């Protein structure tokens, strides 16, 4: 990174803070290939194929320096003389290099912020099952929650105008507009109500997405400060990490870092009445007492997206649900919370009267209906919960198919092991077990009955007795002990990956 800053200072002294001339520097494309640099400035390399090499990057830089004007003139022609038959390859290389250039102001600002603000670290790692548990001290005071998908179908010019506040180089903005209008359709694919980036997409569009989210949340924070007389209790930006750190008692000290598909930072806002947490392309918004505050912010968000970002967003897509009747979906895992009231009776010394203190207990439950809905989206069952085979898995080996089903079953079982009323998990295990059998029977072109007889009953024991085997290694094998452990809340600490079902939602 020091070498990168040295190159940057050299070009700044010559070009008077212009970013556009850096496009003709060959070392910029070398930095685009450097994985170490990418890790230091938060962005992962989008990846090249085997045809991409330093020679191709040098040829693209030389072509850009020699025929940049001819490329703009031939943009409307049927055969682009600048890119030729390697249009996609050269455009990808140039966009990767341009992405490194426009990241310069942001990366330097990020490094400067890290020098001023030290991130507290803890090496006592918690499992991914504590995603919801780290909010348990605050859930007891919340009543309503909204789970909203952030819209992203915005006009290309709005993206350019957003970057005008950060990048002052007009030439770079014109080149960005050229990339967007010519290669937008080849780099992104629309799905549902959000634009999902393909794995082979350039980092440029990943950068544009983060810029859009950053602009939206700055305006969101400004509206919050203008609409309330109370100052925000805490707000901040959490930079992504891979592991979850230890849960600390106070929420505004909790450091929750994770790696996600959009490479976005985690942002949260907390005040006495409203909580806001964003992850990936969604955000949670929760409040207490009445849904009046949630309806007000619903109007704010709809007007912000429609009039500022020119995104048509239907107000009906923002549902305001009671927290006790709603299941939260986070990184592929679903959890529902239930607040049980308990009374603690205490007696003052040397006094005859008793004091009853009513307390709310945070308790997670297994949301069986949303879980079956996730299995239906992943083609493990139909809409009625009847198991079906997965044709896409028939090309894999038998061991890979069984391991995949067992891993999903084990993760769901371990994740909800600390929940109450875990008997509904038997339905989920049944769907996964029978779907696995039907997939294997379809692969071997046999009936389910014939394949089960051939497989034997030992296969089903792997789905059913795993928890009992773990318990038997720790506790004595007695009926009362196993029954108490089954009903009790025991958290597993080995779930360190995102649920496989998240890839299909």
UniProtKB/Swiss-Prot annotation:
One example GO MF annotation: RNA binding
Example of a GO biological process term: RNA splicing
CC annotations in GO: chloroplast
Keyword DNA repair: no
Protein localization: Plastid, Chloroplast
InterPro entries: Domain_X (IPR024937), Maturase_MatK (IPR002866), Maturase_MatK_N (IPR024942)
Signal peptide range: none
Pfam families: Intron_maturas2, MatK_N
Key words, A-Z: Chloroplast, mRNA processing, Plastid, RNA-binding, tRNA processing
Known function: Usually encoded in the trnK tRNA gene intron. Probably assists in splicing its own and other chloroplast group II introns.
Xref: PANTHER family: MATURASE K (PTHR34811:SF1)
Similarity comment text for this entry: Belongs to the intron maturase 2 family. MatK subfamily.
Protein name: Maturase K
Organism taxonomic ancestry: Eukaryota, Viridiplantae, Streptophyta, Embryophyta, Tracheophyta
Gene behind the chain: matK
């Amino acid at each position: 990174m020091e070498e990168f800053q040295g190159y940057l200072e050299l070009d700044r002294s010559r070009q008077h803070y212009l970013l556009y001339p850096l496009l003709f520097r060959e070392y910029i494309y070398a930095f685009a290939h450097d994985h170490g640099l990418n890790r230091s400035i938060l962005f992962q390399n989008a990846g090249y194929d085997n045809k991409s090499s330093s020679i191709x990057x040098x040829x693209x830089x030389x072509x850009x320096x020699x025929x940049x004007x001819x490329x703009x003139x031939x943009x409307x022609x049927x055969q682009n003389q600048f890119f030729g038959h390697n249009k996609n390859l050269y455009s990808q290389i140039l966009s990767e290099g341009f992405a490194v250039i426009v990241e310069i102001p942001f990366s330097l600002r990020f490094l400067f912020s890290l020098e001023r603000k030290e991130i507290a670290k803890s090496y006592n790692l918690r499992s991914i099952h504590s995603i919801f548990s780290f909010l348990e001290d605050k859930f007891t005071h919340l009543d309503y929650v909204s789970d909203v998908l952030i819209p992203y179908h915005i006009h290309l010019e709005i993206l350019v105008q957003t970057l005008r506040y950060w990048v002052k180089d007009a030439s770079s903005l014109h080149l960005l507009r050229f990339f967007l209008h010519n290669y937008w359709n080849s780099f992104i694919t629309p799905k549902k109500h959000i634009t999902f980036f393909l794995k082979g997409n350039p980092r440029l569009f990943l950068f544009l997405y983060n810029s859009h989210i950053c602009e939206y949340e700055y305006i969101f924070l400004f509206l919050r400060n203008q609409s309330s007389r109370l100052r925000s209790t805490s707000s901040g930006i959490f930079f992504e990490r891979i592991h979850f750190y230890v849960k600390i008692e106070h929420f505004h000290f909790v450091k929750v870092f994770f790696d996600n598909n959009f490479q976005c930072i985690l942002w949260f806002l907390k005040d006495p009445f409203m909580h806001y947490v964003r992850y990936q392309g969604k955000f949670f918004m929760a409040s207490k007492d009445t849904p009046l505050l949630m309806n007000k912010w619903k109007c704010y968000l709809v007007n912000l997206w429609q009039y500022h970002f020119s995104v048509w967003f239907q107000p009906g897509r923002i549902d305001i649900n009671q927290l006790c009747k709603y299941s939260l979906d986070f990184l592929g895992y679903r959890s529902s919370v239930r607040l049980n009231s308990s009374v603690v009776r205490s007696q003052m010394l040397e006094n005859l009267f008793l004091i009853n203190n009513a307390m709310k207990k945070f308790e997670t439950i297994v949301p069986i209906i949303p879980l079956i809905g996730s299995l239906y989206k992943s083609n493990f069952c139909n809409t009625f919960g009847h198991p079906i085979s997965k044709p896409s898995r028939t090309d894999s080996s038998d061991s890979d198919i069984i391991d995949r089903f067992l891993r999903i079953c084990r993760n769901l079982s371990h994740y909800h092991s600390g929940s109450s009323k875990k008997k509904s998990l038997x339905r989920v295990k049944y769907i996964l077990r029978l779907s696995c059998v039907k997939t294997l029977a379809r692969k071997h072109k046999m009936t389910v009955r014939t394949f089960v007889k051939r497989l034997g009953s030992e296969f089903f024991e792997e789905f059913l007795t795993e928890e009992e085997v773990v318990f038997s290694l720790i506790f004595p094998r007695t009926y009362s002990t196993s029954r108490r452990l089954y009903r009790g809340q025991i958290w597993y600490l080995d779930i360190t990956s995102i649920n496989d079902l998240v890839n299909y939602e």
